[in-house]
Amino acid sequence: MDQYTEKKWQEAWSKSKIFQPALDRNKKKFLITVPWPYTNGSLHVGHGRTYTLGDVIARYKRITGYNVLFPMGFHQSGTPILALASRLRNGEAKAISQLTRDIATYEPEQNIQKILKTMVEPKNIADYFSDATVKDFTSMGYSIDWSRRFTSADDFYQDFVRWQFLKLQRLGMIHQERYPILFSPAENNAVGEDDISDGDIDKVSIEEFNTITLI
């Protein structure tokens, strides 16, 4: 199918709000979610596979009579975006190259440096690639209800996560203990393997040493 025809039908779907389910008590309800993309760069072919599978299921359920809700969120929290902005502010060549390449996926060359300069602020990285992902998913023809778009950085979502932790703590299902963790002095924050360059390859481990005092 040529791009003109694709765009024609994508615009028709959007105008008719065909993927925004209305209340229908005569239909069974079906909610599908797919893990949200992390918004620190452009998408790759693996994303295409993941979200195409979700879309196939959503469409199949629609044609078999279900009232389907297929929303989409964006993962904007966590230290990788903060670290990327920090590396950009520090002028790290690898970070500059990575973002330049990713921006070039969506922008003409004359716009790249202007956009790159804004990305010293983490929120600008997250928001730019969230918007870019919407365009990618729309061009793929995914049957997502964009009226319910949200991010993990939204106030209501942060409040919901906080409520979950406090609720579980009050029920005695989670508790805080002292335990060795990965920690970044630069960010003054705990980090996971995904936050560390080659963290899944060059693993940090706890070493134990026994000392013997000779008298």
For each predicted feature, which ranges?
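N-terminal, positively charged nucleic-acid-binding surface of large information/translation enzymes
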Residues: 1-215
